[in-house]
C-alpha cells in the first residue's frame, strides 16, 4: 500500500527552496521560543488577512495547509456583501465560480521563505501564504498568485523584474481612536475616521528640522523595518506637513511585492502602538493636507542568467532598445492598467497638472511631470524607468503585475513610445483616466492583455467589485464630488483613512 501524501506534497505546492526553508524556520521558531505565527495573505485591496497560529498548528500547516474562509473576497472595505454568497455561484455571476456558494473555505499554503520575526510583537512570527482550492489548484482571486504568474511570464522570456519601492504617506498623531459605540460602524456602514492632528506645520520639502520633529516615532519605524531585514534606503520629509517618504533598495520580482506589503503593514502597526496613525490613503480629508501621496515604481529588467541590467543605454541612447519598448508598453497600457495602479476613488485626486503627478501618458528624461520618467546614463548599471502613476494605497501584487504585463507587451510587439516630452503637462498625448469609473471602462474596453495573466475570472470580479465602490461613492456624494479637483469627501475619509 502506498503512503498517503500530504496536501502540499501531493499537489507539488512547494519548491526545494521552500522545503529547505521550512526546516530552518521550525528550528528558528524553537530556538527563539516563539509561540504564535501570523499566517497572512493579501486580499483584493492589498490588506493583510489571516490567522495567528500556534506552533503546533503551523507545523500541521507545513503539511496540509490551513483552511480559511474566502468570505473577505465577497466583501467591500466596510464588510458589506458585494457578492451574495447565498445565491448560486456565490453571487459572482461567473460560471467558473459555481463552487463559491455558501462561503466555502480555501487552503492557506505557507511560504516558509517569507518568514520573519516581528520585533514589536511578543514571541510572534509572521509568514505569507498562497491561497489554493482544496483540489490544490490556485485560487483565482489570490493577488499573490497573479504576481507569480506575471513573474513567470517574464522568466519564460529570459528576464527578471527589478523594482525599487518609493512610498509617500501621511504620519499623524492620534487624538481620538473613534471607539465610541456610535463611531464603530456596521456591516455596510462606514466607521468614523480616526481623529488625528498633524506632526509638523508648513510646506517645506526635505526640511531636516521636520525629520527631527518626528524622530521619536520614526526611529522606532526605522528600527522595526531594519530588524525585518527590509532594505530601507531613506526616510524623507515630503512637501506637505506630516507627509513622509520611505524608499528601499532594489529588490527582485515577488520579493519586492511581498516587501511592499510588509512595509506598509509594519509602518501602520508600529505607529499605532505608539499613538500615531500612518495612512497610505492618497489624499486625506484633513485641512492643510493638500498634496496627494504617490507610489513611484522604479523598474528595470535584468538577464535571467547574467543578471545584467538590460535597460543600460549605449552612447546616444536615452535607454536601451529593450527599455524603450518596455516604456512603450507602460504608456500604451497606462489607461487600461489604471485601476491596478490607482484603485481607489480617492487616488484620482492626484491626477492634476503641475502637481508632480502625471495626468497624461507622456514619457521624459528626468522630468517628474511625466508618467514614465527615464533615469539613465550611458553605461550606468542603475539605469531604470520610473512609473509615477501609482497611489500608495494600491495592492502591491496587482500594481507590479500590471507593470510586468504592460512592459512585456511592449517588448513583444516592439511598441514605440514616440519622442521624449520636454513639457509633459502640455504634451499632445492621450490623457490618463481622471476617475475610477473611467479607469474601469478603459480596462474593460482593452482587457485582453490583462486577462491573459490576471485571468478572465479575476478581471470580471475586479470590474464588478470596483464598480460597486464607485456606485457607493456616487450614492453618498453625488456626481459633482467626483471631479478630481474637488474637495476630498467625508465618504473617502471614512472609507480609506483608517485601513489603507
From Swiss-Prot:
SUPFAM superfamilies: Glutamine synthetase, N-terminal domain, Glutamine synthetase/guanido kinase. GO terms for biological process: glutamine biosynthetic process. Keywords: ATP-binding, Ligase, Nucleotide-binding, Plasmid. Residues 32-136 form the GS beta-grasp domain. InterPro entries: Gln_synt_N, Gln_synt_N_sf, Gln_synth/guanido_kin_cat_dom, Gln_synth_cat_dom. One of its GO terms (molecular function) is acid-ammonia (or amide) ligase activity. Its EC number is 6.3.1.18. Optimum pH is between 8 and 10. The keyword Amino-acid biosynthesis does not apply. It catalyses: aniline + L-glutamate + ATP = N(5)-phenyl-L-glutamine + ADP + phosphate. The keyword Nuclease does not apply. Signal peptide: none annotated. GO terms for cellular component: cytoplasm; membrane. Residues 143-500 form the GS catalytic domain. It is an enzyme of class 6 (ligase). Optimum temperature is 40 degrees Celsius. Involved in the initial oxidation of aniline to catechol by the release of its amino group. Catalyzes the ATP-dependent ligation of L-glutamate to aniline to yield gamma-glutamylanilide (gamma-GA). AtdA1 has a broad substrate range and is able to convert the following anilines, including chlorinated and methylated forms of aniline: aniline (100%), o-chloroaniline (92%), m-chloroaniline (69%), p-chloroaniline (92%), o-methylaniline (40%), m-methylaniline (27%) and p-methylaniline (45%). Belongs to the glutamine synthetase family. Homohexamer. This is Gamma-glutamylanilide synthase. The lineage of its organism: Bacteria, Pseudomonadati, Pseudomonadota, Gammaproteobacteria, Moraxellales. The gene is atdA1.
Amino acid at each position: 500500500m502506498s503512503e498517503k501524501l500530504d496536501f502540499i506534497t501531493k499537489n507539488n505546492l512547494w519548491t526545494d527552496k521552500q522545503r529547505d526553508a521550512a526546516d530552518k524556520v521550525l528550528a528558528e521558531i524553537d530556538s527563539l521560543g516563539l509561540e504564535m505565527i501570523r499566517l497572512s495573505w493579501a486580499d483584493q485591496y492589498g490588506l493583510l488577512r489571516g490567522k495567528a497560529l500556534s506552533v503546533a498548528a503551523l507545523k500541521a500547516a507545513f503539511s496540509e495547509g490551513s483552511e480559511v474562509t474566502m468570505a473577505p473576497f465577497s466583501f467591500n472595505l466596510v464588510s458589506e456583501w458585494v457578492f451574495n454568497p447565498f445565491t448560486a455561484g456565490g453571487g459572482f455571476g461567473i460560471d467558473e465560480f459555481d463552487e463559491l456558494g455558501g462561503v466555502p473555505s480555501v487552503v492557506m499554503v505557507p511560504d516558509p521563505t517569507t518568514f520573519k520575526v516581528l520585533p514589536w510583537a511578543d514571541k510572534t512570527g509572521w509568514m505569507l501564504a498562497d491561497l489554493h482550492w482544496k483540489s490544490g489548484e490556485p485560487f483565482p482571486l489570490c493577488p499573490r498568485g497573479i504576481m507569480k504568474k506575471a513573474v513567470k511570464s517574464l522568466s519564460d522570456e529570459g528576464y527578471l523584474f527589478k523594482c525599487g519601492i518609493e512610498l509617500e504617506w501621511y504620519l499623524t498623531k492620534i487624538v481620538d481612536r473613534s471607539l465610541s459605540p456610535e463611531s464603530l460602524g456596521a456591516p455596510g456602514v462606514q466607521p468614523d475616521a480616526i481623529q488625528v492632528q498633524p506632526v509638523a506645520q508648513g510646506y517645506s520639502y526635505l526640511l531636516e528640522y521636520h525629520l527631527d520633529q518626528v524622530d521619536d516615532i520614526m526611529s522606532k519605524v526605522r528600527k522595526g523595518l531594519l530588524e525585518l531585514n527590509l532594505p530601507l534606503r531613506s526616510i524623507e520629509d515630503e512637501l506637505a506637513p506630516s507627509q513622509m517618504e520611505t524608499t528601499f533598495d532594489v529588490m527582485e520580482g515577488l520579493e519586492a511585492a511581498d516587501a511592499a506589503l510588509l512595509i506598509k503593514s509594519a509602518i501602520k502597526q508600529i505607529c499605532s502602538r505608539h499613538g500615531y496613525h500612518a495612512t497610505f490613503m492618497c489624499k486625506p480629508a484633513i485641512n492643510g493636507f493638500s498634496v496627494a501621496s504617490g507610489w513611484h515604481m522604479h523598474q528595470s529588467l535584468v538577464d535571467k542568467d547574467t543578471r545584467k541590467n538590460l535597460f543600460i543605454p549605449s552612447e546616444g541612447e536615452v535607454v536601451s532598445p529593450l527599455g524603450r519598448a518596455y516604456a512603450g508598453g507602460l504608456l500604451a497600457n497606462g489607461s487600461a492598467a489604471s485601476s491596478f495602479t490607482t484603485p481607489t476613488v480617492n487616488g484620482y485626486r492626484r491626477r492634476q497638472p503641475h502637481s508632480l503627478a502625471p495626468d497624461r501618458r507622456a514619457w521624459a528624461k528626468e522630468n517628474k511631470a511625466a508618467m514614465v520618467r527615464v533615469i539613465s546614463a550611458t553605461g550606468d548599471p542603475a539605469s531604470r524607468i520610473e512609473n509615477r502613476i501609482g497611489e500608495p494605497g494600491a495592492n502591491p501584487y496587482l500594481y507590479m503585475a500590471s507593470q510586468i504585463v504592460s512592459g512585456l507587451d511592449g517588448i513583444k510587439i516592439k511598441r514605440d513610445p514616440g519622442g521624449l516630452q520636454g513639457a509633459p503637462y502640455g504634451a499632445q498625448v492621450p490623457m490618463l483616466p481622471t476617475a475610477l469609473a473611467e479607469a474601469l471602462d478603459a480596462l474593460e474596453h482593452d482587457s485582453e492583455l490583462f486577462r491573459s495573466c490576471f485571468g478572465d475570472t479575476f478581471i470580471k470580479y475586479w470590474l464588478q467589485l470596483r464598480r460597486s465602490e464607485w456606485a457607493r461613492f456616487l450614492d453618498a456624494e453625488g456626481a459633482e464630488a467626483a471631479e478630481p479637483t474637488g474637495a476630498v469627501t467625508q465618504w473617502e475619509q471614512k472609507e480609506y483613512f483608517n485601513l489603507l
